[in-house]
Regions:
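Alpha/beta-hydrolase fold nucleophile elbow
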Residues: 131-143
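Glycine-rich nucleophile elbow surrounding the catalytic serine of serine-hydrolase chemistry
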Residues: 141-151
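Alpha/beta-hydrolase active-site loop
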Residues: 109-130
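An N-terminal hydrophobic leader/cap segment in hydrolases
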Residues: 1-43, 51-53
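The serine-hydrolase catalytic nucleophile loop
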Residues: 72-85, 98
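Conserved alpha/beta-hydrolase
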Residues: 86-105
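Short beta-strand element of the alpha/beta-hydrolase
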Residues: 62-71
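Hydrolase active-site cap/lid region
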Residues: 151-185
Length: 185
C-alpha cells in the first residue's frame, strides 16, 4: 500500500506538466536593469519545442557560453537571480525550459532521462549553430538539472566545465541514499 502511494506520487510529479503557479513569484529579465534577453528555440528529438533565451549584459566575454539547467517543478525563470549573477559576471547565458515545463512543449516532463535528452538536444543545436560553433560551452545545473549536467559529459566530452548544484548522477543511488526500510529499493 505504501509503495503504491509512493509510486503514485512519483508518477504525478514526473508524468505531468510543470507550469507556472501563482504560489511562486518568478523574476524576469525586465526585473534586472540592462539585462538583455533574446529568444532561441530548439526542436527536441521527439519534436517538442524547447523554449529558451540568451541572457547577457552588453559586451559579454567573447566565445564563452553557459547553459543553465533548471530543477524539477519550475522552468528556468525560477533561477533568474542565478542566471543574472552569471550574466553580470560577463557570461552569455542560455537558459531554457525542459520538455513539459513552462514555455516548452510536451504534455509531460518525461522524467530524469528526458532532461538529459533535452540538454543533449540543446548542446547539439548550439554546437551546430554558426554563431556558437567556436564557443567554450559550460553547463550549470541544479537538482534535476544537476542530474543531466553530471551525465552530459558522456555525450558531450568537449564541454569546458560542468557545475552541479545539489545534483546526483545516479537515480538508483539517489533513491537508495534517501529512502530506508521498506522504501529502500
Amino acid at each position: 500500500m505504501i509503495l503504491k502511494k509512493i509510486e503514485e506520487a512519483y508518477r504525478s510529479a514526473i508524468y505531468t506538466r510543470a507550469d507556472a503557479t501563482k504560489a511562486i513569484f518568478y523574476f524576469s529579465a525586465e526585473d534586472f536593469e540592462g539585462l538583455e534577453k533574446a529568444s532561441f528555440v530548439v526542436r527536441s528529438q521527439k519534436g517538442h519545442r524547447l523554449q529558451g533565451y540568451f541572457y547577457s549584459y552588453p559586451n559579454p566575454k567573447p566565445n564563452r557560453l553557459i547553459v543553465f539547467e533548471h530543477g524539477m517543478g519550475s522552468g528556468h525563470r525560477g533561477y533568474m537571480k542565478e542566471i543574472e549573477v552569471l550574466a553580470r559576471a560577463g557570461y552569455l547565458v542560455y537558459a531554457y525550459d525542459h520538455t513539459g515545463c513552462m514555455e516548452s512543449g510536451g504534455e509531460v516532463t518525461g522524467g530524469f532521462s528526458q532532461s538529459l535528452m533535452d540538454l543533449d538536444d540543446v548542446l547539439t543545436a548550439l554546437e551546430k549553430h554558426e554563431e556558437y560553433q567556436n564557443y567554450d560551452i559550460s553547463v550549470v545545473g541544479h537538482s534535476w538539472g544537476g542530474f543531466s549536467t553530471q551525465n552530459i559529459m558522456a555525450i558531450h566530452p568537449d564541454l569546458k566545465n560542468v557545475v552541479a548544484l545539489s545534483g546526483f548522477s545516479s537515480v538508483k543511488r539517489m533513491v537508495s541514499q534517501h529512502f530506508s526500510g521498506m522504501l529502500k529499493p
